A protein has these predicted regions:
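Conserved small-residue-rich beta-alpha loop and adjacent elements
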Residues: 89, 93-173, 225-227
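Short, structured coil segments at secondary-structure junctions
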Residues: 147, 202-203, 223, 290, ...
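C-terminal core of ALDH-fold dehydrogenases
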Residues: 33, 282, 331, 336-448
Length: 449
């Protein structure tokens, strides 16, 4: 059985590798036509999707009754007509985005008729392992296709019926478009297949896990393949002593209440001691009216009646209507707390002092840092990136919400006319010019300047 799993997974990855080489040369019009075909098929097969999803939801609700699943997981699993339409529209929006491939990122003359170009290209074979949300399968497949990457998809067992059907729709819709290579998308389902996939670091170029912090940590700890993702979303809002307190209250409430289950919701509210007595009573009243369970440090509890916070609270991603509050001395104390306890995801400062804002924004270690705005804005769609494959808190390759650009890398292309390295070496070496210029790489043609 183990041999069969390894053989099957290896074969799927090999097929994806071969398809990736061909997909890298598929023109934008063909890739867009394939995406439009996916969107149309989703609408045409809506009833089938709803039936498959209903089976998943029914099984998940039984698991919920036994205490094995959470309500949040069941909620993320559900699809309806509105959601299916939004998925189709998302695919169309990906098609409408500018082509991320072939863009000349830089052009440099090394000498006459010797030009170096840095050009955006696909990564190759990307794998995604995700939990709960069946819409993630379509979203990631669409982004992979647009960016010229082959993709290996692994969804959670709780969405198995939905995932199988959605994969079938994606595969059949793109197979109907001339020029799209067969095998560019692969579906794996068994946990053993994931373990084997994570061993194939010579064949798979990138893994993108989406799920709980424990789930992402498991992926990171069990592969040598580069992993793009984040383990936690411990986000903070800092209310500075010079904040507009009315605005601060609205932002602080939005950052927690608008959608508490997502990774960009605030988990800890930091309040400058200069405004603690004037700010905390009002915002606590608002939180309590929204059903938020509050915890606070000793200084917070001197002002408002909330449960005591523990050290563990400062590093907890609640993912629910829960919030910790801490009173701090100043912006520097706030920065220290964030850097000691944050997850490098998203942080926000509320202040009318631009110098204090700059201090905070440049001093905290996070992929996104906001001034006078809710942490909930940390999202690829809201950033204008279109759909996203996830959020990366790493500092290499891609950071923050990752859209199409994050699924590309680059190659150096050198266009010459028979130049020899020997010409540029030794006592009479010809000097390089090393001049930057505006130009687009065209195969076999040097720039006309």
């Amino acid at each position: 059985m183990q041999h069969d799993v390894e053989h099957d997974t290896d074969a799927q990855v090999t097929d994806a590798q071969r398809a990736a080489l061909r997909l890298a040369n598929v023109d934008e019009a063909t890739r867009n036509a394939a995406l439009e075909s996916i969107a149309a098929a989703l609408r045409e097969r809506e009833a089938e999707i709803l039936d498959a999803n209903a089976a998943d939801v029914s099984a998940a609700e039984a698991m919920l009754d036994r205490g094995e699943y959470t309500q949040a997981l069941v909620d993320r699993l559900k699809l309806d007509e509105t959601k299916i339409e939004s998925i189709a529209e998302m695919v169309e929006s990906v098609a409408a985005q500018e082509d991320p491939l072939g863009e000349t990122l830089s052009a440099r003359e090394l000498d006459d008729d010797l030009e170096l170009y840095r050009v955006a290209v696909p990564i190759g074979v990307v794998a995604t392992v995700f939990e709960s949300r069946p819409d993630a399968l379509v979203q990631i497949a669409a982004l992979a296709l647009k960016s010229g990457n082959a993709v290996i998809l692994k969804g959670g067992s709780e969405a198995s019926e939905s995932n199988r059907l959605l994969y079938e729709i994606v595969r059949e819709a793109t197979a109907a478009v001339d020029g799209v290579p067969d095998g560019w998308a692969q579906l794996i389902e068994a946990h053993e297949e994931v373990d084997r996939l994570l061993e194939l670091d010579d064949e798979v170029d990138l893994v993108m896990p989406r799920g709980s912090s424990e789930f992402v940590s498991y992926i990171q700890d069990n592969t040598q393949i580069p992993v793009l993702g984040h383990t936690e979303g411990v986000c903070h809002v800092f209310v500075d002593g010079e904040a507009d307190l009315s605005m601060a209250e609205e932002v602080a409430v939005d950052a927690k209440v608008q959608y508490p289950a997502v990774c960009n919701a605030v988990e800890t509210l930091l309040v400058d001691e200069a405004v603690a007595e004037s700010f905390l009573p009002g915002v606590v009243e608002r939180y309590e009216a929204e059903g938020v369970e509050l915890r606070g440090d000793e200084r917070t509890r001197e002002v408002v009646d909330v449960d005591p916070a523990t050290e563990a609270d400062w590093r907890t991603e609640y993912g629910d209507l829960e919030l910790s509050i801490k009173v701090v001395e100043d912006v520097y104390a706030a920065m220290e707390h964030v850097n000691d306890n944050g997850s490098k995801h998203t942080e926000s400062i509320l202040t009318e002092n631009p110098e204090t804002a700059e201090t905070f924004m440049t001093g905290v270690d996070a992929a996104s840092v906001f001034h006078n705005a809710s942490t909930r804005f940390a999202d690829g769609y809201r950033y204008g990136l279109g759909a996203e494959v996830g959020i990366s808190t790493g500092k290499i390759h891609a950071r923050g919400p990752v859209g199409l650009e994050g699924l590309t890398t680059y190659k150096y292309y050198l266009e010459g006319d028979g130049q020899l390295v020997a010409t540029y070496a030794g006592e009479d070496a010809r000097p390089f010019t090393h001049r930057e210029f505006d130009g687009e790489w065209t195969p076999g043609r040097r720039s006309e300047r």
